[in-house]
Design a protein with these regions (language model features):
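Conserved phosphoryl-transfer catalytic core
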Residues: 51-72, 372-431
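Short beta-alpha connecting loops at secondary-structure transitions
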Residues: 137-144, 377-390, 446-454
Length: 557
């Protein structure tokens, strides 16, 4: 079953649409937005202007009508870009789960300003910054700035709630054998310990992780811990917490010699691919690295995906082998992350994020889902991508996902890996809206007659079905299947949670068909949607009464 989504269209529109069904549901959002280079800028959010009017009103055209660059001497050099980013980041926060994180790749031009708006939206305490080394030390070509070689870019982490975000740890290669002891004669062997709390002065009394612990000696210690109370109780019960020789010291978490030594992810990403390896990956998958400029390496995205969404398996960036890691509660079967986590990228470009998700899903057998969003920005007619048939960036991104999935399946024995994805395009609603500007009685009469069928011509039944899913708060991965019952075709959503019949002509017999279908599906709750034009006033009342008596809700469109 296809559990992944690709959306073509403006990402601001996409975020607004997704909000109804995906609010508080996204675990990780990664974006690599267009950097503010002063060149042509394709994201304009004032929908009252045409593209030409916008360029003219913002003084982006010269006397000959040619596009100007966005020079730093222009007062709006930074504000134009930041005004584009702000509403998108604001909506992105609403989509994140409580333990979710937004990750942004950015260069030196806007790091300072971007950090300011991220702090305003997410809160200053919910921001971290890392550095990605984007070139090898021996790389021949690199940007020179201020007499120095520019070898890095920035990665910003914006947490919805930093106290609830959990980052997976990575295995260190050091030999720690000399540091292990066994002062309490634990039968599991020698161990070392680590703090499992903030210091008393750095604890937040308002945090959900702020609670009391009573030591074996009876001493009460109150501070902000790094695990929830129920998990701490389980760790104490399992003798994984050490309170010192006298049983009165601050708790420390024990890690045994036969368990890997773990390290928190560092702020320097130096072994997770470079711009050069990213280009090589594009070449391997698409046949030519010139198909897409400035992609991020899949290794970087794989690293980010693992530390955010996987509590059980992590990859040491220096190695290629999969390794099992320990986290507090692992021995008790505590799963801190959902194997079906959703990852969103709303500047998806060549679909590096989707490619990376397919790779890590194949390696650890989890079922992460993705939502890719990309504006169908046209490729230059003189460019190689255009000549090879890629008329816009979306065509490149979709083809990369297909080829990457096929390559992964070909090279692995994981025949259960789901590599399929659904494609949606943002457009005007499938339903004709009422025009509020009509005033005269004749205009009202014509409007009523003209909207007896209020569905836009040329739209398919599935177009209507998926818009209705979003209107009713269901996501785009909802199960949809067709079922024919006598003369009526139904779209059955999520095993009968929603039944949609778009037949233009129906009679009162549909009520019994619905009752029979509900019984066959063995569903308790059921909501039915019918076309308003398919009903007359009498049949509508009778059908409503028949269904209402069986606790089935009826809506018409």
């Amino acid at each position: 079953m296809k559990q992944r989504i690709y959306i073509e269209g403006d990402n601001l529109d996409a975020l607004k649409i997704l909000l109804g069904s995906y609010r508080n549901r996204i675990k990780m959002i990664y974006i690599d937005p267009p950097y503010n280079t002063g060149k042509d800028f394709v994201y304009h959010d004032n929908r009252t202007e045409t593209e030409l009017e916008h360029l003219e009103s913002t003084n982006q055209l010269n006397e000959d009508g040619q596009l100007l660059e966005n020079p730093k001497t222009e007062g709006k050099y930074h504000s134009n870009w930041l005004n584009m980013m702000y509403p998108r980041l604001y909506l992105a926060k609403k989509l994140l789960k409580e333990d979710g994180v937004l990750i942004i790749s950015i260069d030196e031009n806007e790091i300072k300003n971007l950090l300011e708006i991220c702090s305003e939206i997410f809160g200053e305490d919910n921001i971290d910054t890392a550095i990605w080394q984007k070139v090898d030390n021996d790389s021949g070509k690199m940007k020179i700035t201020y007499r120095m070689r520019l070898e890095h870019e920035y990665v910003i982490f914006c947490y919805k709630n930093k106290n609830k975000s959990f980052f997976n740890k990575f295995i260190e290669e050091r030999n720690y054998k000399n540091e292990y002891t066994n002062p309490d004669n634990d039968p599991r062997g020698p161990w070392i310990s680590a703090l499992i709390s903030n210091t008393e002065e750095n604890s937040n009394p308002n945090s959900d992780l702020y609670y009391d612990i009573t030591t074996p000696s009876g001493k009460v210690i109150t501070r902000q811990w790094r695990v929830e109370k129920w998990e701490m109780d389980e760790l104490i019960k399992d003798n994984r917490i050490y309170f010192g020789n006298k049983g009165e010291s601050a708790p420390r978490l024990k890690s045994f010699i036969n368990e890997p030594k773990l390290s928190t992810p560092a702020t320097l990403f130096s072994n997770v691919g470079t711009a050069k390896t990213a280009g090589k990956m594009i070449e391997d998958i698409m046949g030519d690295r010139k198909v897409f400029s400035y992609p991020k390496p899949t290794e970087l995205l794989e690293h980010l995906i693992r530390i955010v969404t996987d509590s059980r398996f992590s990859l040491n960036p220096k190695k290629s082998s999969k390794r099992k890691v320990f986290f507090p509660g692992a021995d008790m079967g505590i799963d801190l992350n959902d194997e079906n986590e959703i990852i969103l990228d709303f500047f998806s470009g060549s679909s590096t994020t989707a490619h990376a998700i397919l790779k890590v899903n194949n390696e650890d057998n989890l079922k992460r889902k993705f939502i890719m969003v990309q504006l169908p920005e046209k490729t230059d007619e003189k460019s190689k991508p255009y000549k090879e048939g890629y008329k816009n960036i979306c065509e490149i991104g979709k083809e990369r996902i297909r080829r990457a999935g096929d390559k992964i399946l070909e090279e692995s024995d994981n025949k259960d890996l789901d590599i399929g994805f659904k494609v949606f395009k943002i457009d005007e609603s499938n339903f004709i809206p009422w025009n509020p500007k009509i005033k005269t009685e004749k205009e009202v009469e014509q409007a009523i007659l003209g909207t007896a069928n209020n569905i836009v011509q040329g739209r398919s039944e599935l177009d209507l079905v998926y818009e209705l899913l979003l209107q009713f708060g269901l996501d785009l991965n909802a199960e949809v299947e067709e079922k024919q019952v006598n003369n009526h075709k139904f779209y059955v959503v999520n095993n009968g949670f929603l039944l949609i019949c778009l037949n233009p002509n129906i009679d009162e017999s549909i009520a019994q068909d619905i009752l029979n279908l509900k019984e066959d599906l063995m569903t308790e709750y059921c909501r039915v949607i019918l076309l308003d034009e398919a009903l007359n006033s009498v049949s509508s009342i009778n059908i409503f009464n028949d269904l209402n008596s069986e606790d089935i809700e009826l809506d018409t469109i």
